[in-house]
Amino acid sequence: MSLNQKALNSYVYTLAFSSLSFGLIFGLYLFVYSGFMAIALVTIAIIAFYALITYLVFAAPLQVWLRRRRRKFSLINFLIYIAVAFSAVFLFWFVDYPPNALTMFRSFEYYIMSIVAAFIYWFWDSIFLRN
């Protein structure tokens, strides 16, 4: 499958905007949660970088596969992104904390992070999807 320049630009824009959005949302959340400490704003760039890697590994290949059916703001695509996001967050949690891997399902942050990450990527993918 060959990618033309327009499609490649769309993938890159989706990846960049999703990573920056994710970093901004969770970085600002940590800024407020830390009591408005200015140093917490550095986390925006750190979170955006980690989001870029995660989106590149998990969401970008899925995006290429889902783009075979070109539908903007498809609820089915959103649910697929959510399922992959749950799997990705679980995988990273399992690698970091193997003995406590199942405790993450009791964590509210697990669900929020997964759903927000999926929503952000799905939203930007739908915005940059061109017919």
Curated annotation (Swiss-Prot):
It is a multi-pass membrane protein. The keyword Secreted does not apply. The chain crosses the membrane at residues 12-32, 38-58, 75-95, 108-128. Keywords: Cell membrane, Membrane, Transmembrane, Transmembrane helix. It comes from the Bacteria. One of its GO terms (cellular component) is plasma membrane. Its main location: membrane. It is found in: Cell membrane. InterPro entries: UPF0715. Disulfide bonds: none annotated. Belongs to the UPF0715 family. This is SPbeta prophage-derived UPF0715 membrane protein YopD. It comes from Bacillus subtilis (strain 168).
